[in-house]
Every structure is written in C-alpha cells, then in structure tokens.
Amino acid sequence: MNDPIFVKNKIKPFNKIISVTGDKSLSIRWALLASQAKGKSRAYNILRSSDVINTLNCLKRLGIKVKLKKKYCEIEGFGLNKFNNKKQITLNAGNSGTLGRLILGLLVCHDKKIRVVGDKSLSKRDFSRVIIPLKKFGAKFKYKKNYKLPIEIIGTRNH
C-alpha cells in the first residue's frame, strides 16, 4: 500500500459575497464546502433539485446545522473535518454522482463508520476513481464488487 497523503495548509477565513447562478453542481459543491467552514455560510438562489436536497439531508445526518428558507440556505459548520454525528449512519446520495463522490472525500478524515447508498441507477456506477486515491489518505472501504454502492467508509483522524 502507498504511504498516506497529508494536507497541511488550511483555507484561511474570509468574509465575501460570491454570486453564482442557481446550478445543481454549484449548489452541491457550495453546501459541502460550507459544511467545512466554521460558523454560518449563506447562499441565495441555490437550486432546489432532489440532488441538492439529498446533499442538505446528508449534511444534517452528519450533524451539520442546515436551514433552508424561502430565499436562502444557511449552513453552520464546525470547521474542517468536524462532523457532529455520534454514531454510525447511512447517507443517501439518491441519484447524485457528484454528491456520492464528493461526500466520500469529506469523510476521509471522519472516524465514524459511514455507509453511503444511492438509488438503483447510482448503485450501478463505478466509484474506483474516488476510492483508490482516497485509500492513500488512510481511509478503509467496504463495497460491492467493482467499487459500487453501497460503500462503507471508515476514515482516519490523521489529517
């Protein structure tokens, strides 16, 4: 097995307003990044598709505070790699390959066993391009043959 990779530099805090379109991919990525910030992040005009709602639900299951209001979404995170779930949980990515792949990356430094599932279509997709590199960070995985969902990840606190 290869040596683990360690990320040393963290993103410095900033207080900026960033304007983007209500796009599914951007909305998912914003929510996941906001979950890693310390404090509140607010986005206006996020897309309210099933993939984005599944993302917000996954973050809630991980103990992140999420408020979805009529005009905005607010996420209150605890900082980098700081999820607040106390037990093993299952996260449902629905049909979102973006969510399924990116959430695995966030869970690498989480020390709880997390099961990621998806719908019938997503469960046919190959996750090897994510799992193989993430193993270098020290995470352990259990999955069906050919790197398919459901996937269990046990991360590592080595970060």
Question: Where do the language-model regions lie?
Answer:
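Structural preference for solvent-exposed beta-strand-turn elements
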Residues: 1-159
